Amino acid sequence: GFDTEKHAPELAHYNTEGIVCPKCESILQYRLNTYANLGDYVCLNCDFHRPELDYKLTELTKITNTTSEFVIDGQDYKINVGGLYNIYNALAAVSVAEFFGVAPEQIKAGFDKSRAVFGRQETFKIGDKSCTLVLIKNPVGASQALDMIKLADYPFSLSVLLNANYADGIDTSWIWDANFESILEMDIPEINAGGVRHSEIARRLRVTGYPEEKITQAEKLEDIMALIEKQDCDHAYILATYTAMLEFRDILAQRHAVGKEMN
């Protein structure tokens, strides 16, 4: 787990799920809350708390929208993807590797070779635009994706593609629990709302206070691609639910912008 800077116990964000003590049903508090309900939790009403850590991340050295550097058990590591959630994935990988006696140098070599896979910070070109595709499928994941792209030090256009097929989840009300308000903290001149539920995601974006005249709706993903190609920004982020991501990749593959394989 994370064992970075701590503070006196305090409540998690009011919109956080899964923070009820499983022993006494009191509300958990956190000495360290990384995101959602993760971190160093403690119940002030009974003895329930996070177990002692066998493997510790003690420092977040540098985090950008494309890379992350951190210290686990005294070793410096770097991964070639952004996002706090990917640091958790790396921590899990290091923990398993250490348990089986894999040397830190081998772990670092593995991280150095790893790259983003399909739909998970996958990069490609649409015309002359440098684009990144990011899968979103729930409030926590969407909020973390938004936190990640917020670290970009350049302006970018944003496209949010919302479908409601069974693989996406037919109930799209989760978008109201995701922190789309964070777009107001970013340098985003234009936003495209696409997919089967384009009007719903456009409404969610309007509610944040983002200017309505800067939001363009298009159900067809080919039209979203055309919008990205003609917009002024050199960079574009595309946040897409699962089937929207697959459909978007199919169009990209037909244009030979990405490979058809999903690896």
Identify the role of each PLM range.
Residues 1-6, 161-162:
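Conserved phosphate-donor/acceptor-positioning beta-strand/loop module used by diverse small-molecule
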Residues 4, 86, 198:
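Short, flexible micro-motifs
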Residues 8-11:
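Active-site neighborhoods of enzyme catalytic cores
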Residues 13-18, 22-28, 33-50, 95-102, ...:
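ATP-dependent carboxylate-amine ligase
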Residues 47-125:
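Long, charge-rich boundary regions
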